[in-house]
Amino acid sequence: MAAYTIASHPVRDFGTWKSLLDQFESIRKDGGELSAVVLRHSDDQNMVTVINTWDSIEAFQALFNREDLNSGMAEAGVTAPPTIIIGNEA
């Protein structure tokens, strides 16, 4: 059963953040990501929401807990911890 995540957080600069997100694509895919959609908030262009589909919740959790992902988020300019919703298809 597919799992879904919706993560929202501010970034210092969208272009920088998006470039680094794209660099992690193969790592995300190898970690069980099936798809990703990036949204920029209409009222704040440096606030983003990413909607992902995963093989499983466990796959997402394993990837999200990787140290290189967390340091990559800081390098990309994420300025606050993300708000994350995790769920399975009903």
Locate each region found by the language model:
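Short S/T/G/P-rich N-terminal loop/turn motif that feeds into the first structured element of a domain
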Residues: 1-71, 75-90
